[in-house]
From Swiss-Prot:
Expressed in the thymus and to a lesser extent in the spleen but not detectable in non-lymphoid tissues. Highly expressed in thymocytes between the pre-T-cell antigen receptor (pre-TCR) and positive-selection checkpoints and expressed at low level in mature T-cells (at protein level). Phosphorylated on Tyr residues quickly after TCR stimulation. It comes from the Eukaryota. The gene is Themis. Induction: Down-regulated by stimulation through the alpha-beta TCR. Residues 1-260 are annotated as: CABIT 1. PANTHER family: CABIT DOMAIN-CONTAINING PROTEIN (PTHR15215), PROTEIN THEMIS (PTHR15215:SF1). This is Protein THEMIS. The lineage of its organism: Eukaryota, Metazoa, Chordata, Craniata, Vertebrata. Residues 583-636 are annotated as: Disordered. Belongs to the themis family. The modification Phosphoserine is found at residue 586.
């Protein structure tokens, strides 16, 4: 049965791609397809096309006035795909009437963003489990078991995860759960736009470093309706170029997938398709059909129409690093362990005594200089003046006399005097400031830094990597090594020179290749010379990595509150007095670099915060700009 192209797209289940279509009739010019504004706008009767994908071409947005449920929309405008804003996704109030509708409409996949949550209005009785009314159900993956398509789901009860499967035939009213996470527009486009539905979002933050004009009114942080405009991606018979068709093209099509030999079409694979391949299917020979512009890969590795060998896919480690500088924008890098440059240590800054406790190590005694004063009402605790030096040892609990006897967590240190040292006890709640004194002049390889020190760690390139023509790290004023990141890579080589291989990041490469049949492959991949490179990533990619890695580890406990309002008042007064006091000249003799204080998310002190905290960092920063710095709250 013939359908309009729009009707076909509306009913298309993306899990059934690719599909083969035959053009039945429509308004068009005779002859083959031709291109206008990057889209195919004409198809001949009888033309056969294999549909390989349905992508969002652009995003239209409408500003909502009033409540989300009954908002009046203003004139829609295009929201650029690279818009540097952060959004909160509002739950869709329209129910899904079956599991099949959810899987056909919502993106469910291996990504951390591909696990949507729904709840059901009634109890669902399973063989060994009862899903309660309103209980959040996480959809993890879709798979076929014994010929039946099932959805792998899970619920969490008392911190215990319970797994189960639901068939596509399961019916009922399923509603989206509230989502407290914050997303970029790119993430929403890829994972959070249900097919054939709009998405209401709330703008929570906007980067003022964007060069283009802000499409929103000044100080706007309201709700929007996002309306995607799709394009169909496909390939014509005997052609290797990808064609793009707008669903609004006035033609009728017929699905002939079951009766047509798909081998007449060249086999095109995207980066996602390569990711889904099993390890046994590698190596393969392929021709690059399309490659994303603006990638930071060496131009000689991947070019259009170049034949390459994709040897395998695997996980590899990178060190996430950021420039140490007081102004923005900062640059961010992924450094491979194979990097051959050498580093020297740079001093770290610590805003509280609690941060000193986290940073101390068994390898060496942490030596710091105070940059802010601290006065205490307790004789058992040590006052601090600007320029005081301390050797940090360990934390313990001590008793102080204040409205009775109470216990306080302290950091036991040695205060360095001219010729002697004296014991000092600094309360962990102390909101002072310290700069590290570096005595270590050794040059380190990146692998040595990984094994001998804890993140975050400050360094500067002392000897550049001579094996790299342009070492982008050598020009940086300093680097903060923040985290060890594990990511997915493809091992790729030039077909003409298969011995020299490169690690190519799968998640940051938008590439389409055509498999080349009949080409001989290298016999032994174990003899290949693997080359890695330092990858510069965007700020969006950086924050996504920090957010994901932070969600995998438990956060450290927050520093304890100040014990009394009186002492807080006295401390604040003393800090105000110290603002007029310059650092003593003697401090310069310690060869301490004193960069300006970094924001908390870049100094690394919050790098292990839970994902919810990381997601809300934009809101916090915006509040800080309006109302001044926010004080951390934590139990005693």
């Amino acid at each position: 049965m013939a359908l309009s192209l729009e009707e076909f797209v509306y009913s298309l289940d993306l899990r059934t791609l690719p599909r083969v279509l035959e053009i039945q009739s429509g308004i068009y010019f005779e002859g083959s397809v031709y291109e206008m504004f990057g889209n195919e706008c004409c198809l001949s009767t009888g033309e056969v096309i294999k549909i390989t994908g349905l992508k969002i071409k652009k995003m239209m947005a409408e500003i909502c006035e009033g409540a989300i449920g009954g908002c009046e929309s203003q004139k829609p405008f295009e929201l650029p795909m690279n818009f540097p804003g952060l959004f909160k996704v509002m739950a869709d109030k329209t129910p899904y009437l079956s599991i099949e509708e959810i899987t056909r409409t919502v993106n469910i996949g291996p990504s951390r963003l591909g696990h949507p949550c729904f709840y059901h209005l009634k109890d669902i009785k399973l063989e060994n489990l009862i899903i309660k009314q309103g209980e959040p159900i996480r959809f993890n993956s879709v798979e076929e078991i014994n010929g039946e398509t099932l959805v792998n789901c899970g619920v969490v009860r008392n911190h215990q995860s319970h797994s189960f499967t639901l068939p596509l035939s399961q019916e009922g009213e399923f509603y989206e759960c509230e989502d407290e996470h914050i997303y970029t527009l790119k993430e929403i486009v890829e994972w959070k736009i249900p097919k054939n539905r709009t998405r209401t979002v709330k703008l929570t933050d906007f980067s003022n470093k964007w060069d283009s004009t802000n499409p929103f009114p000044e100080d706007f942080y309201g709700t929007l309706i996002l309306k995607p405009v799709y394009e169909i991606q496909g390939v014509l018979k005997f052609q290797k170029d990808i064609v793009r068709i707008l669903p609004s093209l006035d033609v009728e099509v017929k699905d002939i997938t079951d009766s047509y030999d798909a081998n007449w079409f060249l086999q095109l694979l995207s980066t996602d398709d390569l990711f889904e391949m099993t390890s046994k299917e590698f190596p393969v020979v392929a021709e690059v059909v399309e490659i994303s512009q603006g990638n930071h890969l060496p131009q000689s590795i991947l070019q259009r129409e170049k034949t390459i060998v994709i040897h395998k896919k695997y996980q590899a480690s990178r060190i996430l690093a950021s420039e140490i500088r007081s102004n923005f924008p900062k640059r961010h890098f992924l450094i491979p362990i194979s990097y051959k440059g050498k580093f020297k240590r740079r001093p770290r800054e610590f805003p509280t005594a609690y941060d000193l406790q986290i940073a101390k190590s068994r390898k060496e005694t942490l030596h710091v200089v105070a940059t802010k004063a601290f006065h205490t009402l307790h004789k058992e605790l040590s006052p601090v003046s600007v320029g005081d030096q301390f050797l940090v040892h360990h934390s313990e609990t001590t008793e102080v006399v204040f409205e009775g006897t109470r216990k306080v967590n302290v950091l036991t240190c040695e205060k360095v005097l001219n010729k002697t040292r004296e014991d000092a006890q600094l309360p962990l709640y102390m909101e002072g400031g310290f700069v590290e004194v570096i005595h270590d002049k050794k040059q380190y390889q990146i692998s040595e830094l990984c094994t001998q020190f804890c993140w975050p760690f400050n360094v500067k390139v002392a000897v550049r990597d001579l094996s790299i023509k342009d070492d982008i790290l050598a020009a940086t004023p300093g680097l903060q090594l923040e985290e060890d990141i594990t990511d997915s890579y493809l091992l790729i080589s030039d077909f003409a020179n298969p011995e020299e291989c490169w690690e190519i990041p799968m998640s940051r490469l938008n590439m389409t290749v055509r498999l080349v049949n009949g080409s001989s492959l290298p016999a032994d991949a174990g003899l290949l010379q693997v080359r890695s490179f330092v990858e510069e990533i965007t700020e969006e990619q950086y924050y996504m990595m920090r957010r994901y890695e932070s969600s995998l580890s438990h956060p450290p406990p927050r520093p304890p509150k100040h014990p009394s309002a009186e002492e807080m008042k006295l401390t604040l007064l003393s800090l105000a007095e110290e603002r007029t006091i310059n650092l003593p000249k003697s401090l310069k003799s310690h060869h301490v670099d004193r960069p300006k204080k970094l924001p908390s998310d870049e100094s690394g002190q919050d790098s292990r915060a839970p994902v919810g905290f990381q997601n809300d960092v934009a809101d916090v920063e915006r509040q800080k700009s309006k109302h001044g710095p926010l004080q951390p709250q934590a139990p005693l």
